[in-house]
Structures are given as C-alpha cells and as structure tokens.
From Swiss-Prot:
Its cofactor is Mg(2+). Gene3D superfamilies: Phosphorylase Kinase, domain 1 (3.30.200.20), Transferase(Phosphotransferase) domain 1 (1.10.510.10). The active site is at D125. This is Cyclin-dependent kinase 2 homolog. The modification Phosphotyrosine is found at Y15. The keyword Iron does not apply. Autophosphorylates in presence of cyclin cyc-1 but not in presence of cyclin cyc-3. Changing T158D: Phosphomimetic mutant. Increases catalytic activity. Its EC number is 2.7.11.22, 2.7.11.23. May form a complex composed of at least the catalytic subunit CRK2 and a cyclin. The gene is CRK2. Keywords: ATP-binding, Cell cycle, Cell division, Cytoplasm, Kinase, Magnesium, Metal-binding, Mitosis, Nucleotide-binding, Phosphoprotein, Serine/threonine-protein kinase, Transferase. GO terms for molecular function: ATP binding; cyclin-dependent protein serine/threonine kinase activity; metal ion binding; protein serine kinase activity; RNA polymerase II CTD heptapeptide repeat kinase activity. The modification Phosphothreonine is found at T14, T158.
Length: 288
C-alpha cells in the first residue's frame, strides 16, 4: 500500500470501499478494499484462486486488474481507473442514449463478455454501475468474477439491497445452474435501459421482479420453457400474463435491434443467444 497515496473515497460497492489513488509516477488507479466477512479467518484460498484468474483477463473492454495486495487481514485490488459509469451517464441522458452510442456500448459489452465466457468466467452481477466509460467512448466491464470469488451477497454491506433488476428469471426462481446465460439476460436488460433511458424491470423484491418480467414477456409454462415447473420457486398459481408486443415498451429501437433483444431476453435460459452469436447479429451489420 506504500506505493499509493492521495487516497480519495469514490464509492462503496457490493464488496467493499473504492478509492482513487496515485502511485509514485503520478498514474491514477482505483483501489478496491475488500471487506472480509470473518476477519479472524483471513482470506479463503478459493478467493485468492478466483482473483488470480481475473489477473489473467486481458481485454480492451475489461477493466484491468493490475495488482493484488493481501495481508492476513486485508485484501486490496488495484484496478485501472475510469471517470464515469453507465448509470451516471443514463441519469443525465433523458430518454435514453442516441442509437449509435447504445449500439457502440452494446458491441463493446458483448466483446468483453464473449472473451470471458470463452474462458469460462462469468460475471454474475452485470448492471450499469459495473460498466465504466472513458472520454473516448470506450466501455469497460468492472468487477468481473468478483461475484464468484466472494459469493453473491443478498444485501450490500451498507444495508442497501443488491439490485435485482438485471437478474434472470431462472435465478429468481431458485436455479442453481449458473451458466453464461445469466450474463446474457443482464446484457439484454442493460440494452433496453440504454434505449429507453429507464430500467425495464425495476422490481422491489424477488416476487415483484418476477411479476414485472412476466407482465411484459408473459408467464412461462412447460410448453415454452421445458422443466420450468421443476425450479424450486416456481409457483403453479403464478398470474398468467400474455407477452406484450416488443414495440409497446421499447422506444426507437429498429426491427433488427428488437430481434436481438428478444433473443437475449428469452425466459428459458437454454433458448438465449450466446455473446458470440449476438456479435454476429444483423443489428451490428447496419449503419446508423
């Protein structure tokens, strides 16, 4: 830690406190001090193993992890620093992003996701706050793999409930089979939010989250989602909703954009498009 000075707290995330700091050469970094659940037990070896995997992720659309500082009681991750995140940008862009910007960000997001999925690394906690942006319009994914390294918390340490808005319906219904499809669902939610300017499914509880999804996409059944009835939190008494037309809740997204989004937001995870397939979609072949 002696290498870094001028610590300025810039945020408090799911896993700890984030500081902006400089090294002795004047370069700026983001230092993430990880809170350890049981300080007397030190850092689990599984966590160290997961973090070491993150150090190997080298891609222009993933925030670089430069260094890991760990002592008996403390773990500090040293990341590259970017000025802004997508959530802050959406907060000031009423009515959503320009279509060319949304497309560029989605392309970069999918590139980063495809790279990680190729290496069997899941994010598990994708949301606009985890997508950092610089002045050149580059998007980089932050906190990759941390959800696996530290476990997905139900609450933030500040007692703020971790957002459910980007969580897939299979996970909400208790599926333990985490695969790349949970990240694709989150990407779809983020895509819709970039287009509309507001979250697509802003639920306040797990039950409310599911109902918001069903109200728009329709209530699943064993015809359109085989084995859905076997999920732990599936309820045969779910209110039955018919799916709405995509155009009714998406402003200004063209036909190919709607087609891509509909393939990301499939209720059945086995029917969702992969990141690699999404990158080949006609939506990215058009000029805006």
């Amino acid at each position: 830690m002696e290498k870094y000075h001028g610590l300025e707290k810039i945020g408090e995330g799911t896993y700890g406190v984030v500081y902006k700091a400089q090294n002795n050469y004047g370069e700026t970094f983001a230092l993430k001090k990880i809170r350890l659940e049981k300080e007397d037990e030190g850092i689990p070896s599984t966590t160290i193993r997961e973090i070491s995997i993150l150090k190997e992720l080298k891609h222009s659309n993933i925030v670089k992890l430069y260094d890991v500082i760990h002592t008996k009681k403390r773990l500090v991750l040293v990341f590259e620093h970017l000025d802004q995140d997508l959530k802050k940008l959406l907060d000031v862009c009423e009515g959503g992003l320009e279509s060319v910007t949304a497309k560029s960000f989605l392309l970069q997001l999918l590139n980063g996701i495809a790279y990680c999925h190729d290496r069997r690394v899941l994010h598990r906690d994708l949301k606009p706050q985890n997508l950092l942006i610089n002045r050149e319009g580059e998007l980089k994914i932050a906190d990759f793999g941390l959800a696996r390294a530290f476990g997905i918390p139900v609450r933030k340490y500040t007692h703020e409930v971790v957002t459910l808005w980007y969580r897939a319906p299979d996970v909400l219904m208790g599926s333990k089979k985490y695969s790349t499809t949970i990240d694709i669902w989150s990407v779809g939610c983020i895509f819709a939010e970039m287009v509309n300017g507001t979250p697509l499914f802003p639920g306040v509880s797990e039950a409310d989250q599911l109902m918001r999804i069903f109200r728009i996409l329709g209530t699943p059944n064993s015809k359109n989602w085989p084995n859905v009835t076997e999920l732990p939190k599936y309820d045969p008494n779910f209110t039955v909703y018919e799916p709405l037309p995509w155009e009714s809740f998406l402003k200004g997204l063209d036909e190919s954009g709607i087609d891509l989004l509909s393939k990301m937001l499939k209720l059945d995870p086995n029917q969702r498009i992969t990141a690699k397939q999404a990158l080949e979609h006609a939506y990215f072949k058009e000029n805006n």
